[in-house]
């Protein structure tokens, strides 16, 4: 990226304009929220706003339907952490739940087109597999493509593959049939994308004169304080997250305490419970009388392979401490030196294909002397035995 010119920032005219802009966004109280609009995430890194209906999405949807007069509208949670917190609301708070200055369009769609659009949006989730204890997301489809629909009732069956998930869609209490016609409201960006992908065929019938942001400001002025409201018009089906299973609770605690990486793009699964637990407190440091955690697995040669940075972190303060870094295109180890890098969460799963790899020889610099050691590369880290 391009670094901002600090000298330009310090020019009196530029600095004054910046300060006035920030003050305008943050200091003008537009209204109030009577309570938080988003539920607390059960699992760190898994946004509740993308796995259940929430007041943020329903607020934006209500505003879009009221301004457009459409039958159905679509809303994405542009940022996973977007929320309206209880208390004063300013421009910055409203811009946080709607990042862009979009305007709205309406277009006529058939029931078949509507369901195709909903399937397109539902591809933002991964398919649920037996043993998965969380919902996860398709890393190829970012959150701003993950639309939720207001004006319809529907279910998303995540046990099915993408393209076959939308079920039991109703409009005004009746099943949505392929030959029905609806007026759909979307923002200008989404309309263009849907047209380009051939999901909808109709032409724009109406365009708003105000941006969605301006609509939200006006709505707040008329509904102060804002009350979080959720109509629960959609839900995820086809999954059994085993919420009463104590093993699930253990895995989630590891995520929430930072010892296990977030299962955002790959669900935790009870089938790998023993494997994951086998990496927790699996390193004993005798002279410190402590245990540590290192990502590890047993390789095809029967030897245990450990992520080197985890070992370096664990051995800090012991007689065997060492630092590990990347220098001159190779792993560099400095003995009798404290590790100065970060602690990485454990991987959710080390695939069998990685564990079955034949180790490759790599060059490691130890106190400036190059040696050759067998190693396996996974997710940007070397595992050594």
Predicted region positions:
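Primary recognition of N-terminal secretory signal peptides and signal-anchoring hydrophobic helices
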Residues: 274-385
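Short, well-ordered strand-loop elements centered on a beta-strand within folded domains, enriched
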Residues: 1-9, 161-173, 303, 384
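Active-site-adjacent helix-turn-beta-strand microarchitecture at beta-sheet edges
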Residues: 1-28, 125-126
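Short secondary-structure junctions
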Residues: 34, 39, 226-228, 319-323
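Glycine-rich phosphate/diphosphate-binding loops and the adjacent beta-loop-alpha structural elements
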Residues: 24-53
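Second-shell loop/turn segments in exported
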Residues: 45-52, 102-105, 200-205, 294-301, ...
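Feature captures C-terminal
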Residues: 54, 58-277
């Amino acid at each position: 990226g391009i670094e901002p010119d600090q000298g330009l920032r310090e020019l009196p005219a530029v600095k004054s304009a910046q300060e006035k802009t920030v003050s305008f966004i943050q200091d003008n109280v537009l209204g109030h929220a009577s309570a938080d609009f988003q539920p607390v995430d059960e699992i760190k890194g898994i946004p509740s706003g993308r796995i259940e209906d929430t007041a943020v999405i329903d607020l934006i949807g209500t505003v879009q339907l009221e301004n457009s007069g459409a039958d159905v509208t679509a809303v994405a949670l542009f940022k996973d952490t977007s929320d309206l917190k209880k208390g004063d609301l300013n421009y910055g708070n409203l811009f946080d739940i709607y990042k862009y200055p979009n305007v709205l369009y309406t277009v006529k769609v058939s029931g078949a087109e509507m369901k195709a659009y909903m399937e397109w949006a539902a591809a933002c989730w991964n398919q649920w597999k037996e043993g998965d204890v969380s919902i996860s997301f398709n890393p190829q489809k970012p959150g701003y493509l993950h639309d939720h629909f207001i004006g319809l009732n529907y279910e998303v069956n995540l046990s099915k593959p993408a393209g076959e998930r939308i079920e039991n869609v109703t409009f005004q209490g009746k099943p949505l049939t392929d030959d029905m016609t609806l007026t759909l409201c979307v923002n200008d960006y989404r309309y263009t994308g849907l047209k380009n992908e051939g999901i909808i065929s109709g032409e724009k019938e109406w365009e708003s004169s105000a941006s969605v942001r301006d609509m939200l400001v006006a709505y707040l002025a008329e509904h102060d304080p804002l009350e979080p409201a959720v109509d629960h018009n959609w839900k995820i089906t086809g999954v059994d997250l085993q919420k009463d299973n104590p093993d699930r609770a253990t895995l989630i605690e590891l995520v929430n305490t930072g010892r296990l990486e977030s299962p955002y793009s790959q669900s935790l699964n009870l089938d790998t419970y023993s494997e994951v637990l086998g990496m927790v407190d699996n390193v004993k440091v005798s002279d410190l009388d402590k245990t540590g955690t290192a990502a590890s697995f047993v390789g095809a040669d029967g030897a245990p392979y450990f992520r080197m940075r985890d070992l370096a972190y664990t051995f800090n303060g012991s007689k065997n401490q060492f630092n590990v870094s990347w220098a001159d295109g190779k792993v560099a180890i400095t003995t009798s030196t404290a590790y100065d890098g970060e602690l990485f969460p454990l991987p959710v799963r080390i695939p069998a294909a990685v564990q079955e790899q034949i180790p490759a020889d790599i060059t490691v610099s130890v106190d400036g002397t190059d040696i050759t050691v067998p190693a396996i590369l996974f997710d940007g880290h070397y595992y050594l035995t």
